[in-house]
Amino acid sequence: MGSGPADEEHTVDTEPGVSPPRRTVGGRETVRAAVVVGALGVVFGDIGTSPIYTIQTVFNPEDPHPVPISTNNVYGVVSLIFWSVMLIVTATYVLLVMRADNDGEGGVMALITLLRRMGAVRGSRVTAVLAGLGIFGAALFFGDSMITPAISVLSAVEGLKVVEPGLEEWIVPITAVIIVALFSVQRRGTAAVGRLFGPVMIVWFVSIGACGVSGIARHPEILKALSPTYALSFFFGHFGIAFFALAAVVLAVTGAEALYADMGHFGRRAITRGWLVLVLPACVLSYLGQGALLLGDQSAVSSPFFLLAPGWARWPMVLLATAATVIASQAVITGAYSVASQAAQLGYLPRLRVAHTSESTIGQIYVPWINWVLMVSVLTLVFAFRSSAALAYAFGMAVTGTITITTLLFFYIVRTRWGTPLWLVVCGAGCLLAVDLLFLAANLTKLVHGAWLPLLIALTAFTVMTTWQRGRAIVTRARERAEGSLGDFVGQLHDYRPPLVRVPGTAVFLNRGKQTAPLAMRANVEHNRVLQQHVVIMSINTLPVPRVPDTERTEIDKLGYAEDGIVHVTAFFGYMDAPNIPDVLRLLDPAETEGPIAVDSASYFLSKIELTMGTAPTMATWRKRLFIATSYITADAAEYFGLPGERTVIMGSRIDV
């Protein structure tokens, strides 16, 4: 199976990013509020549901390194959670990392793009190594995308055993049903449901904050945990306990990467305000309230989040928590689609079939292959681990790895791209990376207890992506040598002796651009010595707009020769347009294409590469096999471009890898 025409003959013109909505004088506050509410429904679902399971996991008596419940330990853990959130989420991400954007876009892939640009300019080996580290961070995110829906929905449904212990055996089946339903509706898009996400999350944050206040009111002394002295005293006074506790404390900052990754859709200012005004206070109040509950009743450690709610509110809280965790899962699933799509555009994955589900937001996409891989993976995790506590350390490993890599890449860019003084970078990076590395080290101690899972997923994804990048570079070089210059090839057509036989009919050759000759066209000429009277060489260019009007659909180039029946057409599509080639041909002006094109009888030629195992030492044998296997998921070009199957000719060329 080849790398596929869909991967080779389709280009995407990716503009830098999606600018956040601008404020207008007349509707200044309305626009700002709408954007913040939208961010609440998409960005903060993951981090906003962390209070469900964080403290419960820290004090889990079945933990291999349990934290004993005592008054001092409760103060220390709550203080450690609070200052971890302040240092990692507020200081690292909100105040610092979110300032490093790729023309408005955020996330680890944006940092990789910046590093690749710097590497192209400077040719630095360090830049290349860090870009590779960034790819591993993106691979860790795929692991996060599998673990988040499993642990989030499980933790919410586990509230059933608090309100009705007899339902405990139904937790896993109910979770599985919710997961299947969640992934099954992805193809319909989330635009309609998404409008409800923001208001639901507002209710969620107000509710957990209110429950926290009720707990604090009963034991206001818990407010002392806001002092960093309690965190430091716990950490250094009980280092053996506190160090291992970090592996669970890090669950409080899960979703921090989402704040940065979704910056392109909502803007840094809207996300910052949503975090500081509502999300941070609500989460802190919930943690303080749960700590206060444990001060008065240590037996509540089995489920402090749900037991914090009054008895009459526990059923509604279970339902609300389930809705919130579904929203959190939706955010990370959409993030996986975006990362996969960006990885394909950067050449780390083959061209995937991407369906855009919104005309107003380019980021709302559906990638079928990724969707079903995620669903199977999430269900496997649910049935294998069966509880949120069992998944906690797998989750922590994915989070700490991504955060550490993001922080490292950020400070390298701060120094090399922004020219920040070295002493300032060393101080800032030293402090924040020390915190990140402590969390990472604590999670590494949990390798045998589940932390191996995200590393295995990340290593697998990293290997696939780097192998595809390497293999694609090998194939591209070989293909360019085989194709040759389009201008030279067209010139040679006029110099054939005896002249080429021009047979009646229209031939449409899809190609990657105007620089090289289509392999199918070259093979037809060199082997058959014939060419149709009317030849259209077409390249596809997708623009970052919903739709392109028909008046701006095409650009025609006669390639330097008039009246020879050969033209090059560049067709422009928006990301919501279905790229239908026959429809494009009907739009062409016969005066510009050297006569009318017989669309209903035209033949369409695709160049397809057959990949074979070569003897050249380009890659290890197992990587060659992996590259060839990965090529099978490339989207079918004929179907993608709307070509009639009975008049589509696929002409293959063999390339050794």
From Swiss-Prot:
Location relative to the cell: Cell membrane
Location, primary (coarse class): membrane
Keyword Mitochondrion: no
Name listed for the protein in its UniProt record: Probable potassium transport system protein Kup
Name of the encoding gene: kup
Species whose genome carries this gene: Rhodococcus jostii (strain RHA1)
Cell membrane is among the record's keywords: yes
Region (Disordered): 1-25
Keywords: Cell membrane, Ion transport, Membrane, Potassium, Potassium transport, Symport, Transmembrane, Transmembrane helix, Transport
Catalysed reactions listed for this entry: K(+)(in) + H(+)(in) = K(+)(out) + H(+)(out)
Residues annotated as transmembrane: 35-55, 77-97, 127-147, 165-185, 196-216, 234-254, 275-295, 315-335, 365-385, 394-414, 422-442, 447-467
Species lineage: Bacteria, Bacillati, Actinomycetota, Actinomycetes, Mycobacteriales
An example Gene Ontology CC term for this record: plasma membrane
